[in-house]
A protein has these predicted regions:
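Conserved AdoMet
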Residues: 2-114, 258
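Conserved class I S-adenosyl-L-methionine
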Residues: 108-121, 145-147
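Conserved SAM-binding loop of SAM-dependent methyltransferases across substrates and taxa
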Residues: 120-138
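Conserved beta-strand signature within the Rossmann-like core of class I S-adenosyl-L-methionine
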Residues: 251-259
Length: 283
């Protein structure tokens, strides 16, 4: 059964799925994803469409552009949270960001941060909240730019809107909610002043034409977030992503990954600056 497949034995099933998708003139590389992630996506869509067998679902994909788009969208990494890894954000807030800001006190250049898979925007907005709070305490004007990218236009649209339910704000204090959000019923909207230093754009980390988001012009990031993304891909693709984001860092820049992805960075020439923080620098 495909739903318990080993890629070596079920490559044919993946190729059949790819062929069904391509009937709509859409190309997608299913082989770059970790097989368990593809299985999970297929299983979810089969449940949603009440397909009992794999060939039945493939037939639906071949006939329905809507379902094809839904399946492809299910491959987009869309889950995120505000302040998702508390230890990571605590180290950034208490140590790394204040240090970087102090170094730039007498400089005209801005602090540059890249959120490389921003989903609905929780990650870049979390960073902006910290930056605004630090600068407010220091009585300094904002001098930073956050480049927030995602390969999904749907996710970027949602991030730019900045609308969240009460349940999505669980990791935020009431003070932060009242200061940075406008509330209407159970919906909360990011205030315009928090968006002013964030640049949202669609960007594919596998795009060979660009080494960093075109909107950033030249890369040169002090911090790059590549968190909770790598484990969705196979080793070869992980290496490509790490090389791209690593090359976009300034000297002694920081690469931030998810809690479960720390060992991946260690095996690719990075060292963790604080234990279990998920914050790395190049060796």
């Amino acid at each position: 059964m495909f739903l318990n497949f080993s890629l070596q034995n079920n490559r044919q099933e993946l190729l059949l799925l790819k062929t069904a998708i391509e009937k709509h003139g859409i190309s997608v590389d299913l082989l770059k994803y970790d097989e368990s992630f593809v299985v999970k996506s297929v299983r979810h869509r089969m449940d949603e469409t009440i397909c009992k067998a794999l060939d039945e679902y493939f037939e639906l994909i071949a006939k329905s552009l809507d379902e094809t788009n839904r399946f492809i969208e299910s491959l987009q990494i869309s889950y995120s949270e505000f302040f998702r890894n508390p230890l990571t954000f605590s180290v950034l807030e208490k140590i790394i960001l204040p240090t970087l800001i102090q170094k730039r006190k007498n400089e005209t250049s801005e602090l540059r941060i890249w959120s490389s898979a921003c989903a609905k925007g929780q990650e870049p907005y979390s960073l902006a909240i910290i930056m605004e709070e630090i600068l407010r305490l220091r009585h300094e004007k904002p001098k930073y730019r956050i480049f927030a990218t995602d390969q999904s236009q749907v996710q970027i649209n949602a991030a730019q809107l900045g609308e969240y339910s009460s349940g999505e704000l669980n990791n935020l204090t009431l003070d932060r909610v009242s200061h940075f959000f406008d509330t209407l019923g159970n919906n909360h909207f990011i205030k315009a002043e928090l968006k002013r230093n964030i640049d949202f754009s669609v960007f594919d980390l596998f795009d060979k034409k660009f080494s960093s988001p075109p909107s950033s012009i030249f890369g040169g990031f002090d911090i790059v977030f590549c968190a909770n993304l790598l484990f969705y891909y196979k080793n070869a693709e992980r290496k490509k992503i790490i090389e791209k984001v690593g090359n976009s860092l300034v000297d002694n820049g920081f690469l931030v990954t998810g809690e479960t992805e720390r060992e991946i960075l260690v095996t690719h020439g990075f060292k963790e600056v604080y234990a279990h923080s998920g914050i790395f620098v190049k060796r």
